[in-house]
Structures are given as structure tokens and as C-alpha cells.
Amino acid sequence: MKANLEDLRDSFKVGYEAYEASRKEANDIWDLYHNRHYTQDQLAVLERRGQPAETFNVVKLFSRMLVGYYSTIVNTVIASPVNPRDIDNATMLNDAIAHVFDDNRFDILGDQIKLGGLVSGVLACEVTVEDTGARDVFGRPINRVNYDYVNDSELVFDPASTQDDYSDARFLHRFKWLSKDAVIKAYGKRAVERLDAYYNYLNVDEADFEFNNNFEYTGYYRVFDNFLIVHSVMEDENGERWSCHWSEGVMLKKTRITNQETRWPYRIQFLHSSNVKEYYGVFREVAESQRAINQALIKLQLMVNSEKAFVQDGAVDNIDDFTVNFNRVNAVIPVKELAGIKIEQMSREILDQYTVIDKALDRIQRVLGVNDSFLGMAYASDSGRKVKLQQSATIMSLRYITARIESFYQSLGDDTAKLIRQYYTANQVIMVVDEVVGNRWIELNKPMMEFAGSFDANGQPQMRPILLPEVDPASGEIMEDEDGNIIMAPVNELETELRDMHFTIRIDASAYNDEDEKAQLMLETVMSGQVGQMMSQVNPAGFFQMSALAMKSMKTKYSPDIVAVLNQTAAMLGGDPEAQAQASQMAQGGQQGGQPMSKALKLPQNTNEGVA
């Protein structure tokens, strides 16, 4: 496969046709989620009947519930150093990763990605590095890692890929409509002259402008042109990776991907594994039950009057007057022949429709593995133990989703850490929002200073940075400024530089709910009992390590931060025998000055008792 228009269009066609059924299924589920499942003909029929297009949206109900649940799980990306000498650098890298997540407002963006994964089965995010336009004092660019949610309907996948994280794919296509101004900004003014506005040259339904926008943007005085652009990333037969922007028969932009360790600028994670080429979300088996509920609601609307009257010809003078009087709560209805009128109760049919709804909801809960206790709808007579067991059963059944979300976070964190290591080369100060200790600031790439050989007027030695030619992190070539001068940058202090450190990425998942109260109580009992007291007296450093392990098992929002503090304290005590002795004495209840407790002290005597 080569990075030319012919191969790109062929791979697009192959990928689209391979996953066409999955795309249509995902669109149907999205329509159910957004209450767009009624066609125009069906809406017209309901309007003629005077019925509302009512629905009990189960897809949206459980989507919000699952997204809300996973929002309570704090997935913390942890970069662990491979070499002990990189401990300080790993701390700075973790702070930089946290800054990137906060800067991209991932608390909101992450919920959007998780919703897309639940509905369509694809968790997708674009990860790019952009130049902020700012420069440090030495002229080096200050870069920023940027996240962007990607709708699954815009993506075309490689059918040869077999990995759930899409790591073995040969290509990925993303098509999107861009405004005229955006095209000029990205590709130049001449590109607009070579393109046709509102032309779907891909010949696929999802690529129609009206698919997501309903109509073309036409104002009173002008038409706002939009153009269909495809962004393709691929690996050619020589192992080189390319980023290609093309439209119809025009290659707008073709560049080599310079990310050294991240393969694609897109992070993909499929929610389910399958033996055929498909992807789907958690609501595949729920869709038909959702339609059954909607149909039952429509029938209930037709049965809003629980009685029907069968009138024989000639039994009443005026059928319209009879209808009006019959529908009144209290009415005197004149008739000619009472035997020609039959009243039939419809309550049986109404109960049947409610049974359909109840059974459908029960099937949906069983398919999703979600019980009433997890939904907060347990019976008041249920014991707390029963509720906890049922909630734990739901959490176990949702593990297949939890594992894929954690895998996505780990892959995204790994991409972020590697991009930071490659592109964050400028001297900059980053603010880290820490809810425990408040805001903190870290300085990346702090210049190493050397003695300049002179003193200032106050007798203080003058320092200067050690300058060397700066290398472009993308191309590996010597950097030059706008005037063609070589950019000289300082050698950085090793503790503040991330360029040469080695790390591994893991995920610390902590759910701050109270599902493990019993286990937490048992741990607290051990820590505060005789074993814990003896441990604090004999081995204070080990006691802090035990406390860190106990805190790690507690699913609270601040568990990772408290665990880090406890581990730091244990390390401090382990390397300082004097501090360890003082901690042991404090655990024994030592008095000031180190004097032992008096053995002659007794409880005060009760004056009402006789003296023995």
C-alpha cells in the first residue's frame, strides 16, 4: 500500500464495505438515544391521529446511568520509572500528564467518549500536538497536547486489524465537512478553487452533508460553502507512516508522521471482540425491546378511553351527538333502541400493554446485567447485605466494559506521556490543580547554570546557561528562527528534563462509593488493633507501608494522593533511624523529654468506696 490517491480511495472503499452493517446498526442506536427513531411517514400518521410521538427511552436511561457510574471511577494515569534515577523525573511527568488532562477538560470529554463507546462500541479520540505560538526565553516553541472527540460515523477502519486497540491496523480514514474558511486556513486559498462545494464524492450515506446537518447553509445573500475532506493515516510498504488530507481527486496535504513512539494521531478502542468484522455497543440486544416498548405506548394512547361503544344502525338519532355525550364524565344519552348498543371494557388490553412494557424492561435489565439495587430501586425490606451483594453482582457483570475503558485510558495516557517526552522541550512553568494541597507549579527543562567567571557589584558570582544548538523534536534537525539563525538552547537540569527518561504506564482505578464498607471496616480494625499497635512501635516505616496498602484499597477520590504521601513518609523513616526511633516512641505514648511513663500512677479513688 502506497500513500497515493488510488490506494487511499481503494482502502476507504474496502474498509467502509467491511463495516457497513456495523455503521448502520450504530446509527440506529444513536437514533433511539436521540428520539429520532420515528420516520417522517410514522410521524405524519401519529399527527393525523392526534397522538404524540411518545417513547420511554431506555437507551438514554441506561446510557446516562452507566456514564454516571463510570464518571465516579477515577482512572489515574501513573507513569512509573524503569530506572531508580528517574524517580524525580517520573513525578514531573505525572504532573505534566495531569495538566494535559485538565487542560483538555477530560472530565467532560471523557464522558462524551464513554457515551460513544456504549452506544456504538467505539471509543475514539484524536491526540495531536500543536504549537501554541508562545516561545520561551531561548526561542523554543511551547507545544500543547490536544484531545478531540471523534464520532464513530466519521471513521473507516481497516478490516485486516484484529486487535481491540487497533494497534495492528494499516490505515485509518476520517471524513469530515469543513467550512470554506477552515479549508483556506488549513490548505490555502488555491485549494478552494480546486474543490466542489457540497459534493459527496465518496458515495456513502454518512458522507452526505444533510446526514448530520439536515440542510445546506444558505442565507439571504450568500451560500456558505462546505467541503468534504478526508484525513487518512497509513503505513506504507516501507514502514513509513503518512498523514494525508485529500478531497475527490486532489491531495491537499501529505506529510510524514514524525511522532517517534505513537503510531497514529488517533486512539481507538473497540468495546467488544468478534470473530467477524463488526463492532457494536451494549445496546444491540436492547434495540428490539426498546421498539416493543414504543409500540406498546402507542397502543396505550389509542386506548386512552377504556371503554368502546358498538352502535347498530338506527339505534341513535345522531352518532356525533352520541359520541360527545358518551365521552363526557356525566351525561344523559338519548337512544332509540338500547338493544342496539353494546359497551365493551378495554381494561384487559391496557393491562396487556403494561405487561409488555414491564417484561421488556425486565429483559433489558437482565441483558445489561443491571439490577434494581444498582439502580437505587431496591425494596425497602431488602437487607443491606442483600443490596450490597446485588450491587457487586452488577459491577462484576460490567467488568467487560470497565476493562476496555481502563485499556483506553492506559493507551491514551501512554500516548500523552510519549508526546510530552518528545515535544515538551521548552522551558515552561506548568500549574497543576491539586485538590489536596491546592495549586502547584512545576518547572520543566530548567536551564543548568555555570559560573561565568565574574562577580556582580554585590560580590555574588554571576551565572550563565550552557548553550548548545537546539534540535527539532519532530525532524531531528537543527532548529532555526525566522531569520535563519540557529537557535541556541541551554542544557537542562536532569531532574527537570523528560527527554531521556524511561517509564511504564499503568492505571489506578478508584471508585469513590461505599460498596466496600465491610472490607474497609475490617482493615481499620486490624490497623487499630494489637497487630497495628505493635507494628507502629516495632517498625514505624512498615506501619506506614501497611497504611498505604490499606488506603489504596479504599475507594475514595483522594486515595492515590494519600497513598503517595504515606509511601513517601515510609521511605523517609526507613532511611533515618533517629526519626524511626522518635516515631516508635510517639507510638508508645512517650512523654516529652523521652521519660518513661510512671508505673506508680493509678486511677483516682472513688470516695464512695471504702478504703481497702
Q: What are the roles of these predicted feature ranges?
A:
Residues 72-80, 96, 104, 272, ...:
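Generic signal for short, ordered secondary-structure residues
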Residues 1-49, 125, 134-140, 162, ...:
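C-terminal anchoring/interaction modules
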Residues 68, 88-89, 264, 335-337, ...:
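Short, flexible segments with low predicted structural confidence
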Residues 239-327:
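Catalytic nucleotidyl-transfer cores of nucleotide-processing enzymes
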Residues 1-242, 352, 356-359, 445-478, ...:
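Extended, helix-rich architectural segments
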